[in-house]
Structure formats: structure tokens, C-alpha cells
């Protein structure tokens, strides 16, 4: 199952009992705050969950898979996520679906 923003909104409605528009606004504001912080280069640290941070990747050689031609992959900035200890422990103790 994939967790979506709509699922998070529904969980907030079920647990807190606030109106849907208010729950949607809370979720949208949370994600916008994360985006804004990352856009300005600030790391986002969510206690008990993990950290989002920016990493700079250097230019490197790559290949066009169709032609085999060597092409440069440009330097870029990417978002990385590192899971916190509590999240890692929770995942480790869960049973695989199958």
C-alpha cells in the first residue's frame, strides 16, 4: 500500500475529528514548510523519524543507453533522507508483507 497525502488527511480526520478542509490545510502547510526549508538549503530534522538534507552531486560521466555515446551528467543538488533510529527499529521489527 502506498501512503498518500489524502491518506494522511483521512488519518488526521479520524484521530482528531477536525473538518476535512482544515486537515488538508495542515498537511499541505507541513509539506510546504519542508519544501521551503530545503529550498533555502536548511536541513529538516524530524525527531523520531529522520532527516532530509541537500547533497551536492558532482558532474560525472554517463552513457546514452541507446547509442553507448558518453555524455556528461551535470552537477546537481539532490534531496537525501536518512532514517532515524526509532524509524529503523520500527521497520526492523515489522514483518514483511508477502
Swiss-Prot record:
The keyword Transcription is assigned to this record = yes
Matching entries from PROSITE patterns are given as: HISTONE_LIKE
Record-linked SUPFAM superfamilies? IHF-like DNA-binding proteins
Spell out the molecular function terms from Gene Ontology.
DNA binding; structural constituent of chromatin
Mind telling me which Pfam families this protein's record contains?
A: Bac_DNA_binding (PF00216)
The protein's UniProt keywords, in alphabetical order, are:
DNA recombination, DNA-binding, Transcription, Transcription regulation, Translation regulation
Biological process according to GO: DNA recombination; positive regulation of metabolic process; regulation of DNA-templated transcription; regulation of translation
**Gene Ontology cellular component list:** cytosol
Domain of life of the source:
Bacteria
Q: Which InterPro entries match?
A: Hist_DNA-bd, Histone-like_DNA-bd_CS, IHF-like_DNA-bd_dom_sf, IHF_alpha
PANTHER family named among the record's database cross-references: DNA-BINDING PROTEIN HU, INTEGRATION HOST FACTOR SUBUNIT ALPHA
Q: Which family does it belong to?
A: Belongs to the bacterial histone-like protein family.
Q: Subunit comment for this entry?
A: Heterodimer of an alpha and a beta chain.
> Function of this protein?
This protein is one of the two subunits of integration host factor, a specific DNA-binding protein that functions in genetic recombination as well as in transcriptional and translational control.
Q: What is this protein called?
A: Integration host factor subunit alpha
Task: Give the species this sequence originates from.
Answer: Dichelobacter nodosus (strain VCS1703A)
Q: Gene for this protein?
A: ihfA
